[in-house]
């Protein structure tokens, strides 16, 4: 992420987002980069400090690779045009540093502004801290977030790892329509 802070790249990114109706999506390590840059949750490249959200090591202290169920918590983004609040998706995750953490004030702001995009949920479709469903222990079961204007989205789940013959033995809706 540090090379994206170079003035030429940072200016080009901000021009894309602010003047050319651009969108950015970061999945897994891409989400980590967007958070470290400040593009999510702030919508701009900025210096980060202890008052800012971040992604860190999974609570279990090791890599997790499996399918989880997520729930759409907000559709305040162009990325979610084909989704509805409450939609459930079964998606693969594969990470060792995917736990979203945030100070109380930052978390409250994300929730109040509708920037919590998706959350890990249990079998009843409810956000949970249970490690059986929330694979990294993310606060408020957060799997993905938006920038304030929704143009930038970051998420841990690998929605791109799907196909006609992928995960056929795993129940659930694997189609998360972000690219439509």
Regions found by a protein language model. Name each.
Residues 1-78:
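Cysteine-nucleophile active-site neighborhood
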Residues 72-180:
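C-terminal and late-domain segments of enzyme folds
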